[in-house]
Amino acid sequence: MEQEQDTPWTQSTEHINIQNRGNGQRTQRLEHPNSIRLMDHCLRIMSRVGMHRQIVYWKQWLSLKSPTQGSLKTRVLKRWKLFSKQEWIN
């Protein structure tokens, strides 16, 4: 398997994290902070979108199961407006 060569792009995006251990050894870890940050950001947005969809779904479901007086009133008014528009057209 070929080793990846360092290009200016990888050199600029890679972050070298050097840690000193108690016994004097130094360990080196390569990180890609930009890609890690981007992935975290995407996951956060996706989870927010999922939560929003669930909330909208449950609100719709709850309004169907136990409609409040206000939601019934708006539904009836919407249907009445649609019905009266069709009457005008016909």
UniProtKB/Swiss-Prot annotation:
**Coiled coil stretches, renumbered:** none
State whether keyword Membrane applies: yes
What spans are recorded as compositionally biased (Polar residues)?
1-27
Please list where the region (Disordered) is annotated.
Answer: 1-32
Record's InterPro entries?
Answer: Flu_proapoptotic_PB1-F2
The GO biological-process annotations, alphabetized, read as: symbiont-mediated perturbation of host apoptosis; symbiont-mediated suppression of host cytoplasmic pattern recognition receptor signaling pathway via inhibition of MAVS activity
Q: Name one Pfam family in it.
A: PB1-F2
Q: Where in the cell is it found?
A: Host mitochondrion inner membrane; Host nucleus; Host cytoplasm, Host cytosol
Q: Give UniProt keywords alphabetically.
A: Apoptosis, Host cytoplasm, Host membrane, Host mitochondrion, Host mitochondrion inner membrane, Host nucleus, Host-virus interaction, Inhibition of host innate immune response by virus, Inhibition of host MAVS by virus, Inhibition of host RLR pathway by virus, Membrane, Modulation of host cell apoptosis by virus, Viral immunoevasion
What cellular component GO annotations does this protein have?
Answer: host cell cytosol; host cell mitochondrial inner membrane; host cell nucleus; membrane
Q: Which family does it belong to?
A: Belongs to the influenza viruses PB1-F2 family.
Q: What else is known?
A: Is not encoded in all strains, and seems to be dispensable for replication.
Q: What is this protein called?
A: Protein PB1-F2
Q: Which organism is it from?
A: Influenza A virus (strain A/Duck/Hong Kong/2986.1/2000 H5N1 genotype C)
